[in-house]
């Protein structure tokens, strides 16, 4: 996915809690005129992080009942068991190399911005620029040394160049924190830092009537963005508050339309939005309200040729539709319906060109691109290859072409370009990935308890025999209207090559089938997502994909709610579970209004403090509230000490309760009963949006292989090749 957000619908994801690694990292984009964005892989060392110590006493310790923490990476085995199998040697070799060698991210971390004849990017620990034709050489100009901020392993998250190239602004953060510092550098023969602002989320440049650069930015406090500031530099330096949102359940986000004509001030929560237009040519004029907030109404705005294009769910059906109106008549009564989506359609992104509007869609779990001719309102719908599971958006200022990439969990991104003049989609030529012949992707459905058909995406080797005897790794999320993360991951490729079946369950609460799909899995319909997950796993087994003793389940963040609920209600369906930064204590979290995100989360989980119905409903599925003495699958939890979004206290509380339940059940289970491993791995440092480290990947893979009693030698040797040792 991306590397840049083309539309505020996508850019919004930076501010929604619990997203983190549910999606690929994105950079905000500025493509006015000659802008475009590229990315580089970011190199870093893991050794510093490994030397850190947890700052919360008592958390990094062995938890009885055969478990370990970050200090003990191997589970405790009773003396009666066999020694650790020889296949662990491969894992240990990989882990040793990981701890001593520089690593490359597979996720995008740093954005590049082209403005005029220069490309701005990060090189080493510096913000630099080089001439466009020399962008891939070592001939660059250093603009700012990030080490001046005295941060631990800082990197540039986003870059914006002022319209006349007098200034460049860069948002800088570290792997261990979501807090960002915005640095403004004055461009000259001797570049100097003009100003710095702490705790910045989104930011954009505009130019006023006197050609003065004006910077707008949002200030983040305790993960909440409620304040917008406006700043100028040079002789007329000033920094003033422009807007403050009073409702704590909303947040603010800035988005510059693609043509830079308007800066949009977006005020929103999970279900409702309000947009104000700031004139990109007269930023000192009062902003213009498009439509005041109405509960349940979402809308996002683009601009082209004095017309506003509005993506909104207003009207029936309550799915997204595209409307337009004159820029000088933005009120809702002037909106005209322009394009309607089909049922079961998710709008992934929108991009506006001179003569075309391009919609990136997911319909019935398959990817499409719709190209709308703005001169004649013609629509060309292109069904994309069935192997594709996700888009990676490329910002582009060329009005003649629309480039993008397609990817899947087991296939690296591949470039495609739609050329408007030819009216055709062109595929990148070159070496064909062998995975296309050695694996299969299937789209199947499971019938949930209420009859609703739930889509699944399944991957397995083409030549696999007797799939019922193959290991299965199931993935689920089901919250916030977000899709399952299905970008390319080398470890997923390795698993399929090693005979595993991968299944992605697109349950209600997620967004794969549109807004209603999300609505049917939130608040007092959360149990629909659990019923969907149960139906998916049972359907996989009934159709010959693996069996319970070889079935594992993986989830991140809010996906932990459904996984934890499944472990409590249907533990017999699983053998092992891996959870990362999981949300497990829903009730106590939502009761604690002192937590920074509780008020923003009310639209997703409900308000147990004031609504007894919500409270009782949460009690029915909350993982932490429903633990009981019974057999559980083995559980590996990765938590981060500095996670600001999912409190570590809730994860530890869940682990302790689960440990006690397992111990009580084991006492009465009889001789020979094999209790599960309950593993809590607390990573020093880190935060909710921490990047995927190779150490974490190999640790989790080792856990799955060990729990299923499989030989991991070939898998880890293959993984070493992908990690480029």
From Swiss-Prot:
Highly expressed in the brain, specifically in neurons of the neocortex, substantia nigra, locus coeruleus, and cerebellum, and a slightly lesser extent in neurons in the hypothalamus and hippocampus (at protein level). Also expressed in interneurons in the stratum lacunosum moleculare and stratum radiatum. Serine peptidase whose precise substrate specificity remains unclear. Does not cleave peptides after a arginine or lysine residue. Regulates trans-Golgi network morphology and sorting by regulating the membrane binding of the AP-1 complex. May play a role in the regulation of synaptic vesicle exocytosis. Gene3D superfamilies: alpha/beta hydrolase (3.40.50.1820), Prolyl oligopeptidase, N-terminal domain (2.130.10.120). The gene is Prepl. Its main location: cytoplasm. One of its GO terms (cellular component) is cytosol. It comes from the Eukaryota. It holds the Pfam family Peptidase_S9_N. Homodimer. Interacts with the AP-1 complex. Its EC number is 3.4.21.-. InterPro entries: AB_hydrolase_fold (IPR029058), Pept_S9A_N (IPR023302), Peptidase_S9_cat (IPR001375), Peptidase_S9A (IPR002470), Serine_Peptidase_S9A (IPR051543). This is Prolyl endopeptidase-like. It is an enzyme of class 3 (hydrolase). It is found in: Cytoplasm, Cytosol; Golgi apparatus, trans-Golgi network; Cytoplasm, Cytoskeleton; Golgi apparatus. Belongs to the peptidase S9A family. Inhibited by 1-isobutyl-3-oxo-3,5,6,7-tetrahydro-2H-cyclopenta[c]pyridine-4-carbonitrile.
